[in-house]
């Protein structure tokens, strides 16, 4: 087992990993930017080192500085968390070249799954259903139009190296295709340095369902059930839950088996997530595989009792999985709300500032992952997510009621948050009944914001 792990991240995920390391008897090394000098992950780590100024490109994305700290402090592994360098194949390879273990899949697998058109082709070979679309990259507007005519509008133009909703455009008719394609291509180049594009049939009003995977070095692969991530705004998830009301046990087993097939096809090792869209007609299709721990991993932990970060570390240390598929049972229901420092009434304007007052609720089946404390400075330099509120109940209605109670108790003063919007969603009748898909926020946002 590892003796010392560097956490190449910040915020609540860095705190989550540090706590896990301490529980496993492993020393934790934090890195931080000058803007994060007083952050909680810095205070909780056994050692902490400044790696640069506030700008992410000069700190949390600075591979040279991170690897230097890891080497000089005697670390034998690096955990990348999510975001930043977590899906950077170059970084994964450099960690290994420096004689340390990257807690995640290999650089080759990250490359394969990071290129969405390559991943799509591999899923076809594995027998995993994919959305009808282009076979490989689109080389020109005319080629794209020809493919779109073949599969039928509407279509979704996507960056092969994309993620987080960037480098992506919907197109409903041919006369709009050229503009949508060129806009998505330019955005992909700006965001990812790669303007390789592909295209899929746009599935209207789907559910976004993802399956959590664990795979070890000995060929053992299991899934830990699904998470329903359909409540999202502009392709950014807001709420997640498990299990999904939309899945029968038969469909759950079928999708879970396909998720395992996907992981086995690429020789996946460590924790990963296989994402699907579930169409209104009950058919489902592979979207992508995320080669890292997910923001919403606590939802799965609450219903399975499996510590996913602990399993990540064990797998990276070449230990066998602690669980067989038959050991995995989804007990009760879990729900997560992401709390962001933003103002929904002002177009979700970011709201940096000092947290002047804070009350963190508790109770049975309540978990709050955050780095907030009274006096904490929410920075304008980083992602707006400042907390994750997770609850567990015996069933979906119980967890919804519990989340309403927790959000009504949560106090974060000094900055604006989306807390009240989340609270209102939990009272919306379609949401409570489970009648929602990825278009829910788009359809209900105006009435929810005006209800405040």
Residue ranges of model-derived segments:
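Alpha-helix capping and helix-loop boundary segments enriched in small/acidic/polar residues
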Residues: 36, 54-57, 86, 107-114, ...
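Short, basic, helix/turn surface patches
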Residues: 53-65, 109-111, 129-137, 156-165, ...
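ATP-binding N-terminal substructure of ATP-dependent carboxylate-amine bond-forming enzymes
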Residues: 1-125, 138-146
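Acidic/histidine-enriched active-site and ligand-binding environments that engage anionic O-linkages
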Residues: 147-156
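A cross-family glycoside hydrolase active-site/sugar-binding cleft signature
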Residues: 31, 81, 133, 200, ...
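ATP-dependent carboxylate activation and anion-phosphoryl transfer catalytic cores
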Residues: 7-23, 48, 71-73, 96, ...
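Structural detector of well-ordered beta-strand residues that form the stable sheet scaffold
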Residues: 29, 79, 101-103, 131, ...
């Amino acid at each position: 087992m590892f003796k010392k792990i560097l956490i190449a991240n910040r915020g609540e995920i860095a705190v989550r990993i540090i706590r896990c390391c301490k529980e496993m008897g492993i020393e934790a090394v934090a890195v931080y930017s000058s803007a994060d000098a007083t952050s909680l992950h810095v205070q909780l780590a056994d050692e902490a080192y400044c790696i640069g100024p506030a700008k992410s490109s000069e700190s949390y994305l600075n591979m040279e500085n991170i690897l230097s700290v890891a080497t000089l402090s005697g670390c034998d592994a690096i955990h990348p968390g999510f975001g930043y360098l977590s899906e950077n194949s170059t970084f994964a390879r450099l960690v290994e070249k420096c004689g340390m273990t990257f807690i995640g899949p290999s650089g080759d697998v990250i490359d394969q799954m990071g290129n969405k058109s390559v991943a799509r082709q591999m899923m076809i070979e594995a027998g995993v259903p994919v959305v009808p679309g282009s076979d490989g990259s689109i080389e020109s507007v005319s080629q794209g139009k020809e493919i779109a005519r073949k599969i039928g509008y509407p279509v979704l133009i996507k960056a092969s190296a994309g993620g987080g909703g960037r480098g992506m455009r919907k197109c409903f008719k041919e006369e709009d295709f050229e503009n949508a394609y060129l806009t998505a291509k330019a955005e992909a180049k700006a965001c990812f340095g790669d303007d390789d594009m592909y295209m899929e049939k746009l599935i209207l009003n789907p559910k976004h369902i993802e399956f959590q995977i664990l795979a070890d070095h000995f060929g053992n692969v299991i899934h830990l059930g699904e998470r329903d991530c359909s409540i999202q705004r502009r392709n950014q998830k807001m709420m997640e839950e498990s299990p999904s009301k939309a899945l029968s046990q038969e469909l759950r087993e079928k999708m879970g088996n396909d998720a395992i097939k996907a992981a086995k096809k690429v020789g996946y090792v460590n924790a990963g997530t296989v994402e699907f869209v579930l169409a209104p007609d009950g058919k489902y299709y592979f979207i992508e595989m995320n080669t890292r721990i997910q923001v919403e991993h606590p939802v799965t932990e609450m219903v399975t009792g499996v510590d996913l970060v602990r399993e990540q570390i064990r797998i990276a240390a070449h230990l066998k999985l602690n669980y067989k598929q038959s050991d995995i049972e989804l007990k009760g229901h879990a729900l997560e709300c992401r709390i962001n420092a933003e103002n929904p009434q002002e177009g979700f304007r970011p709201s940096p500032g000092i947290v002047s007052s804070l009350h963190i609720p508790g109770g049975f089946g309540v978990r709050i992952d955050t780095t907030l404390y009274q006096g904490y400075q929410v920075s304008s330099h980083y992602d707006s997510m400042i907390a994750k509120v997770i609850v567990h109940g015996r069933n979906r209605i119980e967890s919804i009621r519990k989340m309403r109670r927790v959000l009504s108790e949560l106090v974060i003063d000094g900055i604006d948050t989306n807390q009240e919007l989340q609270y209102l969603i939990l009272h919306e009748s379609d949401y409570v009944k489970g009648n929602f898909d990825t278009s829910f926020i788009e359809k209900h946002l105006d009435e929810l914001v005006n209800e405040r």
